[in-house]
Amino acid sequence: MIIMADLDRKLIEILDILSKSKEPVGAKIIAKELNKRGYKIGERAVRYHLKLLDGMKLTKKVGYAGRVITERGLEELEKANISYRLGSIYSNILEKTISANYRFGYVVINRCQVYADFNDVLKIIKSVYESGLAVGDRVGIIDREKFVEINTLCSLNFDNILLQNGIFPLHVCAGVVKYEDGKPVEFKEIIDYKSTSIDPLRAFIEKKETDVMGIIENGEGYLPANFRYFGVEFLERFETILEIDELKCIISYGTENVLGLDVGDDKVGVALIGGLTPIAPFVENNYCVEICPMSSIVRLESLHKLKKNPRDIVTKKANIRIKTALSKMFNAMAKVTYDIDEADGDVIVNTAFIDKKYLDEAFDILKEAYKKGLGISDRFGIVEENDRIKIQTICAVTLDGIFLRNSVPLIPKYGGILEITEDKERFIDIIGYDGSSLDPHEVFFNFVDCEKTFLAGFREVHRVAREKLEEVLKKLNWNGIKAIGEPNNELYGIGVNKDMCGVVTMGGINPLVLLKENEIPIELKAMHEVVRFSDLKSYKEI
């Protein structure tokens, strides 16, 4: 049996090369492209690697023309080698920024499929552009019968304009910006590009964190947006570019603080409309949508021109500071007072609200979830609040707090999706706690099923504390730790720093996933409250 988690970087690069070609590709071309990417191997070695990929059914030989990637190969490309893919979003941003050429009409687009009536799609798209909430005034709309294909300009095109004028913008993060009275006020949530294996704007849109239609209809809502910065010495040149800018996608810029994000010394921060903004209303209105950010480079003239009313740029500083999930976790640890010997104390819980009519069904589902060991411990809480039921599950940060009280410091690194099947156990997507304001498990909640994919966290512990960690864990006798790795060795595809051991924790939200899988509407908040452990009930007692 082939363990898919063992794919090395050369194999992944070959899959990536094949995925970007519409025609079969031969060993000679693959070897040439690999050399460009820093892998100095010849045609013979490439043919050997291709045979390995053929054996895994990730590629297929097409006569003498070469190889094509299979559907299984495309799926594997999206999952394999998570440590390598962690920087893929940032790498793709740089590649597309450099490869585009707005001056000569070559632009980066996002490609999306909306399963809806063409006229309905056109009406919504026009309303977004007329309100000024799009990058540029060009869009591609094609009726494919079963779906409508939409191609929108990516905000990277503005970065390309800056680059052509000698300004190199450093891409920091993407998020959602709160609007009041039709103007941007502050970033509500963010994810750093370098801290994620998934596209941040796609994640926020699919999680329904946006409200673009609210901005259009009454001036209040949440906009998908990107954030960059560059050296303050370029400010005058930047403002000259704005005077002739055709894309009209800047919503705010300034020094020190821009919409709640610290810029730092001698820098100018810039917030831009996300290129996926015209797509967000379809997700907000529950249309079936497939999103492919930064998909390709096309001729600008191939896109249709729409009426667009540009909005004013805001330069007012915000009075707030965005807190990362890691900062929230460290503060939450301090609130944990659980004593192992007394089997009681304060713990951190996630909360979820459901309609009271689902109470009996939810009880049965949660009991089954805890029987399967999906909870951090065997306890959860049920609280009636008017016509709603509040469900409380112990959060994994409680484990961090308990271990810290026993002089074992765990360092939270990532939250993500852990895939567990017969032939592989690996993380397939992650977000760094220090690079996101949202708990990663809130982002990934709708992408797991608790059958093959689970919410899980990744921590590090120094090798000298590993033995004590195991002692405390044995004494605690909870389910929360999935695995502890060897010093200096990767665990489930994630590497560690020198002399550190990986620690994989199961997500405290996993029991709630089963409610979602059984189509019970749920309102979720991770790491939300402090409760007494004794106030929670064991599933065995209910």
Curated annotation (Swiss-Prot):
Stretches for region NRD 1: 85-320
Source organism, top-level taxon: Archaea
Gene: nrpR
Taxonomy of the source species: Archaea, Methanobacteriati, Methanobacteriota, Methanomada group, Methanococci
Region entry Winged helix-turn-helix, spans: 12-77
One Pfam family per UniProt: HTH_12
Gene Ontology molecular function terms on file: DNA binding
Description of activity control: Under nitrogen limitation, binding of the intracellular nitrogen metabolite 2-oxoglutarate to NrpR decreases the binding affinity of NrpR to DNA, leading to initiation of transcription.
Primary role: Transcriptional repressor of nitrogen fixation and assimilation genes. Binds to two tandem operators in the glnA and nif promoters, thereby blocking transcription of the genes.
Chain segments carrying region NRD 2: 321-542
Subunit architecture: Homodimer.
InterPro entries listed in its UniProt record: NRD, NrpR, NrpR_dom_sf, RNase_R_HTH_12, WH_DNA-bd_sf
Stated name of the protein: Global nitrogen regulator NrpR
Keywords: DNA-binding, Repeat, Repressor, Transcription, Transcription regulation
